[in-house]
């Protein structure tokens, strides 16, 4: 049975990814900053769960030690944990900037690096020649910066640069590194963003949602399962020759 570890798996996109990977036959290590969320999802799926703060290398190293002590390897790492706040550029504070970069950029870097250091020494997957796979959940804001999200967009641009550089350096070890760029996803975090944006723009939440829909050529809001499906593909053998890529899964909103 292949195994995977997903950060930020206690809710939203991360939970959907964990659920999909379990259906795909993976043993999934469910991790989250909030231990009770990780426990709830882990118990629901019958999978191990860990409290992990991705901004703390010690937490990530402890998680790696648990995984390798029990399983001896890690086939797939999904760096999903992330945060978002919203504010006009002229009103942004250093604290907001630092918070977004600490989790989205530094947290993704620490997560990928910590597990890649162990992956390089493990044997390839049977019959595939790939040692392991790293997937980072970025955002369409990493391709097309968004108003009110200068700090968030910049932190996700950093993730794409990290993915490309890591893909080049880890290719000789036969470790693939890719990103997924979601758009307007129906999650609790998105609901908070809708409320913030409505307040900042003087609109109702319903008007903000309709604006999102107008910007999405395929005409609906994204579900967490849409993102999970792309991660499932990247985890499988059909994606073994893909690395350094950022897959847009946002209904075409990024080209609007």
Predicted regions: what they are:
Residues 112, 155, 163:
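Active-site helix of classical SDR
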Residues 117, 168-169, 240:
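Alpha-helical segment proximal to the catalytic Tyr-Lys
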Residues 139:
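Residue(s) in the substrate-gating loop at a strand-loop-helix junction
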Residues 88-89, 96-101, 212:
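Substrate-binding pocket helix/loop in short-chain dehydrogenase/reductase
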Residues 144, 220, 232, 243-256:
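Short C-terminal tail/terminal secondary-structure segment
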Residues 78, 171, 176, 242-244:
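Short, small/polar-rich loop/turn modules that mediate ligand/substrate recognition or access, typified
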Residues 90, 144-150, 172-173, 188, ...:
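Active-site loop immediately N-terminal to the catalytic Tyr-X3-Lys motif
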């Amino acid at each position: 049975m292949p195994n995977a570890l997903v950060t930020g798996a206690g809710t939203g996109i991360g939970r959907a990814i964990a659920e999909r990977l379990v259906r795909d036959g993976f043993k999934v290590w469910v991790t989250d900053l909030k231990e009770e969320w990780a426990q709830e999802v882990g118990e629901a799926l019958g999978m191990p769960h860990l409290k992990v703060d991705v901004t703390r290398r010690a937490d990530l190293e402890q998680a790696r030690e648990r995984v390798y002590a029990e399983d001896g390897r890690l086939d797939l790492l999904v760096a999903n944990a992330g945060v978002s706040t919203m504010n006009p550029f002229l009103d942004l504070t250093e604290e907001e900037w630092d918070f977004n970069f600490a989790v989205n950029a530094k947290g993704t870097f620490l997560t990928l690096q910590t597990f890649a250091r162990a992956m390089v020494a493990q044997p390839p997957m049977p019959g595939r020649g790939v040692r392991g796979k790293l997937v980072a959940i970025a955002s369409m804001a990493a391709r097309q910066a968004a108003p009110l999200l200068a700090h968030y967009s910049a932190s996700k641009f950093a993730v794409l640069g990290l993915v490309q550089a890591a893909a080049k350096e880890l290719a000789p070890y036969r470790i693939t590194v890719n990103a997924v760029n979601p758009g307007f996803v129906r999650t609790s975090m998105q609901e908070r963003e809708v409320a913030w944006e409505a307040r900042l723009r003087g609109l109702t939440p319903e008007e903000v949602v309709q604006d999102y829909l107008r910007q999405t050529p395929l005409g609906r809001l994204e579900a967490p399962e849409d993102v999970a499906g792309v991660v499932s593909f990247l985890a499988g053998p059909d994606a073994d020759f893909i690395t350094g890529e950022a897959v847009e899964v946002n209904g075409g909103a990024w080209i609007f």
